[in-house]
Amino acid sequence: MNPLILSMILTTLAMGTMATMLSSNWLLAWMGLEMNMLAMIPILTMNPNPRSTEAATKYFLTQATASMLLMMAIMINFMLSGQWSITKLPNTTVSSMALAALMMKLGLAPFHFWVPEVTQGTSLTSGMILLTWQKLAPLSILYQIDTSVDITILTVSGLLSILVGGWGGLNQTQLRKILAYSSIAHMGWMLIIMPYNPSLTILNLLIYILMTLSIFMIMMNNHSTSTLTLALLWNKAPMMMILLTITLLSLGGLPPLSGFMPKWLIIHELTKNDSIILPMSMAMFALLNLYFYMRLIYSSSLTMFPSTNNMKMKWHFTNRSHLTLLPPLIILSTLTLPLTPFLSILE
């Protein structure tokens, strides 16, 4: 793609997200979401082939449906209340329609079916943007309307997302699909805690983005897209394999890594609100995710590939200039658990 066109597309993508995040007006927020969607489609088809075209079509149809539903909710809300403010959703039907539209945009269950298919059909770079940056705009709107929506819908959808995110990834061999199901599960955790403590949603999102970026950068560096290609990584780049293993364990929420912090704080917050069955169910469903992360680690680092590699340090001689961000990302996504006591300052 022409660098000038690519820079224009990325600028539009960033402007759309920022417009939605900074807006308290429904129309401006909706316009930001539309800019975001239209800029994402050429990114999905950056490497033109039938798979990417199909993925872009699925993405467009899903997002357009969600945008139409959201606009309908906005117009009904204006007819009833006479104002465009995002925080004013007096009607339960309107808030449920807006919530359904945002859940569809985020890929939350039961509107999650498009996420694995679209992620698998695109390049690693497009998939990385889809599973990280594209979550910001819809979540910022959800953050503003969390007091107006039904907490039961949030809880049921969140639990279903955690279950689907764990169950769907069990038989997968494609890394992009595994990360897509991981995204669905993490979004479920964020959705459940939002009515109780929205700050924990932001913390969870931040750590999730750091971990996902780290994994995608390692995959892009080694051109790994499946468990078969990942099995070669131990011979080609042992240090990258170690970093990937640690980051996957962090993504699964194992202590003493960073991924344990948001899960621990969310379960603690729910328990403080006299909820016992809900956090217990969330923790049990999260074991499904941990299982397929462990299976991924076992197949790639604890089994030797049946071939010899006479040049063990081949990876030292390749160009690593594009990996400047990887060390700080790895540190932030694995070693921030000791900072947990300082989070009390934010409360």
From Swiss-Prot:
Core subunit of the mitochondrial membrane respiratory chain NADH dehydrogenase (Complex I) which catalyzes electron transfer from NADH through the respiratory chain, using ubiquinone as an electron acceptor. Essential for the catalytic activity and assembly of complex I. The gene is MT-ND2. Its EC number is 7.1.1.2. It comes from Dugong dugon. The keyword RNA-binding does not apply. This is NADH-ubiquinone oxidoreductase chain 2. The chain crosses the membrane at residues 26-46, 60-80, 96-116, 123-143, 151-171, 178-198, 200-220, 240-260, 274-294, 325-345. Keywords: Electron transport, Membrane, Mitochondrion, Mitochondrion inner membrane, NAD, Respiratory chain, Translocase, Transmembrane, Transmembrane helix, Transport, Ubiquinone. It is found in: Mitochondrion inner membrane. GO terms for cellular component: mitochondrial inner membrane.
